[in-house]
Amino acid sequence: MKKFLKLTTVVVSMVMALTFVSCANGNENGQLNLVGTYGLSKVEVESISKDSNGEESITMTTTMPTSTSIRQYGTQKYIDGETTTDMEMDVTITKTEGGYSFNWAKYNIDGVAQGDDAKTKQQEQFDDDTWKEYTAPFAMTYTTTADGTWNDNSNPASSGTYTVDEATSKVTMTTLIDGGNTLETPVKEELSYSNNGKTLVFVEEESSVDGTYKMTMTLTRK
């Protein structure tokens, strides 16, 4: 899980163990089922950064609707003194045989739709390394078992245990081995579950004098 969290922090860079459950093989009759393989389906980032030059706020969502495409949509606001610049975007990027194609549903600055020149400048920042950074988190999976353990699909793998609290709809995942290395101090992370266990949500928040940061990751059982 620690490795997964590190990977997801790059997703917005373009702009600028459980107890045993009774229903281990399905989700019939609305029973709670937290056994299976989960993969990332959505990353949402809300951040505000401040420095001597001004303040920037970003609200951005990244999804991977197909194995060869990612979608990024949201807003960016920059405040410099009395000047405020607002950007809105919604773009789907598809990996093709010869590179990448861009389908812009929206690219507005201060409410004005941008032309091909502005879009091209954004597209020129995108390369194979950027694609790998964006898609790597979506390739990771987490498999939970009925005996209260989990492991991911990295090599070397991370693994640990998990417990569930049905009263609060929370799952606590404990990392015992991180990338093949046994941790002296296990790391615990809390996730919320919904849809009878089909969806897991992890929220990470940070706050300092330089701004705030919140990342919400949605994992869906395959």
Predicted stretch roles:
Residues 1-10:
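Bacterial N-terminal signal peptides that target proteins for export
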Residues 11-15:
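Repetitive helical segments and hydrophobic/amphipathic motifs
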Residues 18-22:
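C-terminal motif of bacterial Sec signal peptides marking the signal peptidase cleavage site
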Residues 24-40:
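N-terminal helix-cap/turn-to-beta initiation motif at the start of protein domains
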Residues 37-82, 95:
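Post-signal-peptide N-terminal segment of Sec-exported extracytoplasmic proteins
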Residues 46-50, 76-197, 201-203, 213:
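Contiguous, well-ordered beta-strand patches that form the walls/edges
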Residues 214-222:
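Short, low-complexity, Pro/Ser/Thr/Gly-rich segments in the mature regions of secreted, periplasmic
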